[in-house]
Regions:
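An aromatic- and histidine-rich active-site surface loop
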Residues: 19-23, 32-53
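Acidic anion/phosphate-binding donor-loop and adjacent secondary structure
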Residues: 69, 100-101, 110-133, 308
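Conserved donor-binding/catalytic core segment of Leloir-type glycosyltransferases
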Residues: 129-146, 152-155, 167-170
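Nucleotide-activated donor-binding/catalytic signature segment of Leloir-type glycosyltransferases, i.e.
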Residues: 179-202
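Acidic donor-binding loop of glycosyltransferase active sites
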Residues: 206-219, 232
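Short hydrophobic beta-strand element within catalytic cores of glycosyltransferases
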Residues: 233-236, 246
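Conserved acidic donor-binding segment of nucleotide-sugar-dependent glycosyltransferases
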Residues: 248-249, 253-260, 269-274
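A short, well-ordered alpha-helix in the C-terminal region of glycosyltransferases
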Residues: 262, 269, 276-291, 297-303
Length: 308
């Protein structure tokens, strides 16, 4: 049953009562013992109500809205879903305390880390990975909390010492707040600000040497396991659940959020050592394969279901 791909479709489909009648019919036909919600959706309260008798398991990606994404509706929706859920899955241990503060019992909270994205590069060979592209990558939705402005300020320091390094900005979002910084950096910046198709993802990572995740707030980041899946080390902010994903000096480096100078130094350091990029990149790839496998996630999920 299709939900929506735009705000217009959401309004139209939400007002389409027949769609919910079909949904109710399907739920009644399956008569599920468990209902799994992989992410918060505006239809969740309705679906949860329809699945009376089923144990509800919900994955919560963020406890509060990020900077620039504040929404009273989403905050209220999250509170409703938390009350309806029997078990909550979080992607990092850092969120547990915040959920407990919102009256969720700790024994009903389970951590299942964000798994890898090796399926984006099924033919990827870590032994053939080129770490001499002289290009670093900022990947994903462009939002205020992701710290792109901090990275661009750091790049102003970086290019004074290493004019060969380029930053690729790849992802969908509003680039206007950063246009002046980008102009100042000239040819050291490459931008692909648009929706990136699945089949394009591999190319951007393959032509990069490492990834920077300069978030100023975060619960965790899906970009990190994605980067590891292509053998790329990550320089990331030491915030939220990110230190659970980036093992400092093993799979990348951690820096304090909003610290332009430290971020620039880390970029210059990693950017000047191909051997270090290769070492950390191989560690990251191994970490993704061994610690962030979908098989491992499935076992943890199975254990959770059996605990209800």
């Amino acid at each position: 049953i299709n939900t929506f791909e735009s705000n217009k479709e959401f309004v139209l489909n939400t007002l389409d009562i027949s769609r919910f009648m079909r949904l109710r019919k399907e739920i009644k036909k399956y008569n599920p013992d468990y209902l799994y919600i992989p992410m918060i959706h505006l239809w969740n309260p309705i679906v949860n109500f329809m699945a009376k008798g089923a144990k509800i398991i919900t994955t919560i990606h963020d406890i509060t809205q990020h900077k620039g994404e504040e929404s009273f509706i989403m905050d209220s929706l999250r509170k409703i879903v938390l009350k309806q859920s029997d078990k909550i899955i979080i992607l990092s241990e850092s969120l547990r305390e915040k959920l407990v503060y919102q009256k969720v019992k700790s024994e009903n909270i389970f951590v299942i880390p964000h798994a890898n994205f090796t399926y984006y590069g099924e033919n990827f060979d870590i032994e053939k990975k080129d770490y001499n592209n002289k290009r670093i990558l900022f990947f994903g939705r462009i939002n205020a909390y992701k710290g792109l402005d901090v990275l661009l300020e750091a790049m102003k320091i970086v290019v004074k010492e290493n004019t060969d390094i380029k930053l690729s900005i790849v992802g969908n979002g509003d680039i206007k707040p950063y246009e002046e910084q980008i102009r100042e950096l000239g040819n050291n910046i490459e931008s692909n600000v648009r929706w990136i198709k699945d089949e394009e993802v591999e190319g951007f990572f393959m032509q990069s040497d490492f990834v920077v995740v300069p978030y100023i707030e975060a619960s965790q980041s899906g970009v990190i396991p994605l980067s590891y899946s292509f053998g790329l080390p990550v320089i990331a902010s030491k915030i939220g659940g990110i230190p659970e994903q980036v093992i400092d000096r093993e799979t990348g480096y951690l820096v304090e959020p909003n610290n332009v100078v430290d971020l620039a130094e880390m970029i210059l350091g990693l950017g000047s050592s191909e051997s270090k990029r290769k070492e950390l990149g191989k560690n990251a790839y191994t970490f993704a394969k061994e610690k962030l496998s979908w098989e491992g996630s499935a076992k943890l999920f199975d254990k959770l279901v059996k605990s209800i």
